Curated annotation (Swiss-Prot):
It comes from Caulobacter sp. (strain K31). This is Sulfate adenylyltransferase subunit 2. Pathway: Sulfur metabolism; hydrogen sulfide biosynthesis; sulfite from sulfate: step 1/3. Keywords: ATP-binding, Nucleotide-binding, Nucleotidyltransferase, Transferase. PANTHER family: SULFATE ADENYLYLTRANSFERASE SUBUNIT 2 (PTHR43196:SF1). Belongs to the PAPS reductase family. CysD subfamily. Gene3D superfamilies: HUPs (3.40.50.620). GO terms for biological process: hydrogen sulfide biosynthetic process; sulfate assimilation.
Length: 305
């Protein structure tokens, strides 16, 4: 079997090799790792990389989906099938406090909804199962606070991120040593761009949620975003009437807090062509990123992904 030398690897092959190295490093050095699964395109790439990294064995860690109960229906439909097909054990956690209080983005706003369902839900799940390392699909090109976060991001005993108290990462040398009670958030695709992700999905034929492709969907224009009416829980404001538009999503989250973009890109080559021409970040469609100045960094300091 021939092996490509590093000098002959393509750009995507180099990224793939780096990500697989990170996955194996954590599996070897940490006692109880887990892979966070948000059902989005970045998670799909991470699952595929993990399956490759440990083939023909099953990946030596489970998947964890922190469920808010407000994801798009198409995301839930894909979740169980993909995890089963790739041989992962899937754990689903819902914050019992948020569930009991009926926390939702309409009555309680995006900030409280995100804090209880996502941040507190994640911290509960990590503590419940005793995970000491969690893989996440964040990338540096997404948002400024993620741009300065290390690949191996250390969290305190309270699961908080202190950007001023992180380990240096020299070349490809990663330090996994933790103080008692500390944990790691690890980002294997930190150095990938949105375009890299799409090209890799196309090259490897990775299954993704159909919402990433343009189709006629019912949306309302709200606060500068096109919000899809995904089920009968959606509350229309006075004067709002859903309109059918050709839209797709560049990022996926809770559907009342995720804006679509008008598009006709219905295939992977068309999406890639669109990415070559775009000048905006994919996270412009996330309502939670616009709560307040530097809100993503504050969320991460409180324990967010």
């Amino acid at each position: 079997m021939s092996v490509l030398s590093p000098a002959r690897l393509t750009h995507l092959q180099r990224l793939e090799a780096e990500s697989i190295h990170i996955l194996r490093e954590v599996a070897a050095e940490c006692e109880n790792p887990v892979m966070l699964y948000s059902i989005g395109k970045d998670s799909a790439v991470m699952l595929h990389l993990a399956a490759k990294a440990f083939y023909p064995s099953r990946p030596p860690f489970p998947l964890l989906h922190v469920d808010t109960t407000w994801k798009f229906r198409a995301m839930y439909e894909l979740r169980d099938k993909v995890a089963s097909d790739l041989g992962f054990d899937l754990l689903v956690h819902k914050n019992p406090e948020a569930e009991a209080r009926g926390i939702n983005p309409f009555d309680h706003g995006s900030a409280l909804h995100t804090d209880l369902w996502k941040t507190e839900g994640l911290k509960q799940a990590l503590a419940k199962y005793g995970f000491d390392a969690a893989f996440g699909g964040a990338r540096r090109d997404e948002e400024k606070s993620r741009a300065k976060e290390r690949v191996f991001s250390f969290r305190t005993t309270e699961q908080r991120w202190d950007p001023k108290d992180q380990r240096p990462e020299l070349w490809k040398l990663y330090n996994t040593r933790k103080h008692p009670g500390e944990s790691l958030r690890v980002f294997p695709i930190s150095n990938w761009t949105e375009l890299d992700v799409w090209q890799y999905i196309h090259l490897e034929n990775i299954p993704i949620v159909p919402l990433y492709f343009a189709a006629e969907r019912p949306v309302v224009a709200r606060d500068g975003s096109l919000i899809m009416v995904d089920d009968d829980r959606f509350r229309l404001r006075p004067g709002e009437v859903p309109q059918m538009k050709s839209v797709r999503f560049r990022t996926l989250g809770c559907y009342p807090l995720t804006g679509a973009v008008e598009s006709t890109a219905a295939t992977l080559p068309q999406v890639i062509q669109e990415m070559l021409l775009t000048t905006t970040s994919e996270r412009q469609g996330r309502v939670i990123d616009h709560d307040q100045s530097a809100s993503m960094e504050k969320k991460k300091q409180e324990g967010y992904f």
